[in-house]
Structures are given as structure tokens and as C-alpha cells.
């Protein structure tokens, strides 16, 4: 089975055994971009390091988990044109239904969860967080053109159901102090 690596940064409380046994950990922030769930970065560990520095005050642990590479049961707002188009149509309809409300990504997702079979069909949401990381590595297509390719695109997974992740595959990979034999 082909696997896709996913990375989660969590606060380092000097509890590596507990982290590996109980992870991943649910995001408890009220401003979570994709709603309630377990947030992991897609494929690039650099994103988890950035999040650890930015959000956890440089006191963090990074764990690696895996999903099936083909991303079954994923509501993909990055790479599935049908999902993206349906999401846009729904957001436009909600804007008309609630003309005085700011229609945000989490609001649309919560409406989907509350008023459809979304949670029966999908176990994760995948989206690219545009402009969240100001230092995203880029490579220009042409010298005097603004167009560029992001070489570490900031793509997040919000896992709604832990069974989406490959069982038993949640392991600390940073910091090195927890990688010493016998510690974890």
C-alpha cells in the first residue's frame, strides 16, 4: 500500500511516550481554519517545524503519521475540482441566505457537516492554506514575471476520524533528544 506522510507539531511537555501512545491530538483552537479535527501538514516536515516555531513558541515535538496515498474519504479542497466547485456553489448560496454574515471556510464546512451526509462520506478535509506561510519557498517561472511555483505548498489535513490514519503509525521524529534508543 502506498502511503502519504503527514506531520503534526504538538507542544513539548517532556512526555514522549504519552505523545506517541495518544496522538494525534485534536486542535482545540476556536479559530481552526477547517473546523474541529486533528490537524496535520501534508508531506513536508518543514511546515510542521514552521508551525512549531510560530504557534508553539519553539517548544514542540513533531510526529509523523500516514494516510493511504490515494486519499480515500477525503474532502479535497486542494486537488479535487468537483469538491472545489461544489464548495464554491455552496458558499455563494450561503452568502445569499445569510447576507449580513461573513461566510468563512469553517462556516461552510460546519453547514456541510450539519445539513448533509458529509461526516458519513468523509473522514478528512484537505486544503491549501494560501498565504499562511510568508517564507514559502518559491521558484519563478520567468525572471520578470510574478508567477511562481511553491516548492513546499502549505497543505493541511483536518482529520475528522482517526481511522483515516494508518493504525499504529504515529511516531516522534523531532526533537532528536526523543530519538535516542530506549527513550521512546
Give a label for each model feature.
Residues 8-9, 20, 62-184:
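Active-site and NAD+-binding cores of ADP-ribose-processing enzymes
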Residues 17-25, 49-71:
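Short, charge- and proline-biased low-complexity linear segments
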Residues 28-55:
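Extended catalytic/binding region for NAD+/ADP-ribose chemistry, centered on the ART fold
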Residues 2-4, 35-38, 59-60:
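Short, surface-exposed beta-edge/turn micro-motifs
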Residues 17-20, 41-46, 136:
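A short linear-motif detector with a strong N-terminal bias
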Amino acid at each position: 500500500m502506498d502511503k502519504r506522510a503527514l506531520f503534526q507539531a504538538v507542544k513539548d511537555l517532556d512526555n514522549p511516550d504519552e505523545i506517541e501512545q495518544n496522538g494525534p491530538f485534536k486542535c482545540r483552537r476556536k479559530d481552526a481554519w477547517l473546523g474541529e479535527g486533528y490537524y496535520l501538514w501534508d508531506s513536508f516536515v518543514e511546515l510542521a517545524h514552521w508551525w512549531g516555531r510560530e504557534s508553539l513558541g519553539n517548544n514542540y515535538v513533531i510526529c509523523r503519521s500516514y494516510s493511504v496515498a490515494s486519499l480515500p474519504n477525503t474532502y479535497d479542497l486542494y486537488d479535487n475540482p468537483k469538491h472545489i466547485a461544489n464548495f464554491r456553489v455552496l458558499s455563494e448560496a450561503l452568502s445569499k441566505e445569510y447576507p449580513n454574515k461573513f461566510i468563512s471556510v469553517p462556516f461552510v464546512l460546519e453547514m456541510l457537516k450539519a445539513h448533509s451526509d458529509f461526516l458519513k462520506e468523509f473522514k478528512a478535509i484537505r486544503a491549501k492554506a494560501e498565504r499562511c506561510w510568508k517564507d514559502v519557498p518559491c521558484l519563478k517561472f520567468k525572471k520578470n514575471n510574478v508567477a511562481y511555483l511553491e516548492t513546499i505548498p502549505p497543505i493541511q489535513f483536518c482529520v475528522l476520524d482517526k481511522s483515516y490514519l494508518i493504525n499504529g503509525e504515529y511516531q516522534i521524529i523531532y526533537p532528536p533528544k526523543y530519538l535516542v534508543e530506549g527513550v521512546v
